[in-house]
Amino acid sequence: MIIEFIHGDILDQPGEGLVCSGNVYLNMSGGVNGALLVRGGEALQIQLHQYLQDEGLKFVPPGFVMEIGPEPFAFRSIVYSVAIDGWYDSNIELAAETLTSALSIIESRGCTSVNIPALATGYGKLSKQDFGVALRRVLSAREWGFELVNVVERNAYGLEEIQDGYRGEQE
């Protein structure tokens, strides 16, 4: 498995699967999901809100993941991933649990490449370095079926922090 750390726009990176960061209210308000919404993902937002309505919920629990779309996007699988609580707090364990669940869905769809953002680090209060620690734990915990994992960050300094956390974690 090749792991690439990329400075850029996650939606512009080739990949079959996409982990999409989200919140407990399933609003596509910023980060990756905000970018999806701006680029034609209104149907994804409707799908998320329909889930809440169908289930009689106002919000979902931290760690919730849900496959959405992927139309109109070229990804084979997009997984909306809630790695924060209602106050936007998170921790390494929650980020790792959420990422594991999201990657498991994407892997089950036969995807051999996946694009991953730094979950819980935008509006969420997890540091980029702590996300790197969570990422390392997830990717080293089992044999994943991915040939390529793209970890994508728009901010160059943030990308360095993710890499520091990823490389600094000792098992």
Where on the chain are the PLM-derived regions?
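Macrodomain-like recognition of ADP-ribose-binding/processing modules
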Residues: 1-171
